[in-house]
């Protein structure tokens, strides 16, 4: 009897230890863009929701100099999740531009797990210069802040400028000084952008409080050239900027952004995470209008994002399962599911 009691005690201790390990909270270090950016704001809201709804995880939003720094951090095993765009994944897969030489040394491949919104990119100028600049090519030779060096929005605008032959003088400045520099005439133009065609970045809102900027749209000929070379063009409502930007419609170049967690989170948990996001989409959109596209049609956003990046990075099995259940998975992508 004594041995039996001792055995029960040992088994009980083992079970207590196992239960402790099962209930252990897993930390997720999630990289995003800099404080003041749309990506940082969005991830802060997303992780707040996930921390509440997934108590077995502890999500932390970590600001980086730019989204690609988070992609590189994940690929080198320093982060558990990243903030990545289809344009960045293209550069990574092609071993070019900001990722030139990086592919050979990375330790793991980023994966697609949650496409969040589109980002739409364009140009702003001072309102007093509206008669001076009529199209993007008029900025050739001018001082233009196209965004911080690591940022994907800058890469998108620079690629468009290169396509159009815009040979501007790139000026790197602190985001907090853009408005004053434009007001003083020390820069002639700057990057503007929106998220989900519904909101803009905090730093752009702050810029509008310091100076009176106008949107500079590409000309009809420039739009034609951009479309012929693979760019999409979308029309954004100027009311997003909460001020007059002196155009009836804003012509922007969209691309896709996602908050992508790696294979350390198993299929079942990513699937659960996506269902939580879908269920709470209205709450997310209320806290940040950047989630408007998720609220409107999360399934469509996942399909569009996957279509844009399927050739460059694989898909998390949790996202693949979720998309299959929604009837939006294409069987030709089966070989692109991450293992």
Task: Give the ranges of each region predicted by the language model.
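Bacterial N-terminal signal peptides that target proteins for export
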Residues: 1-8
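Bacterial N-terminal signal peptides
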Residues: 8-17
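Sec/Tat signal peptide C-region and signal peptidase I cleavage site
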Residues: 19-23
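Bilobed "Venus flytrap"/periplasmic-binding protein-like clamshell domains
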Residues: 25-53, 57-60, 121-184, 194-195, ...
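Extracytoplasmic small-molecule ligand-binding "clamshell" domains
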Residues: 41-76, 82, 245-247, 338
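Pocket-lining segment of extracytoplasmic ligand-binding domains
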Residues: 86-87, 95-105, 112, 125-130, ...
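Ligand-binding clefts/hinges and TM-proximal coupling segments of bilobed small-molecule sensing domains
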Residues: 134-135, 140-159, 230-299
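An extracytoplasmic/periplasmic, membrane-proximal ligand-sensing/linker region
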Residues: 177, 194-215, 225-227, 268-339
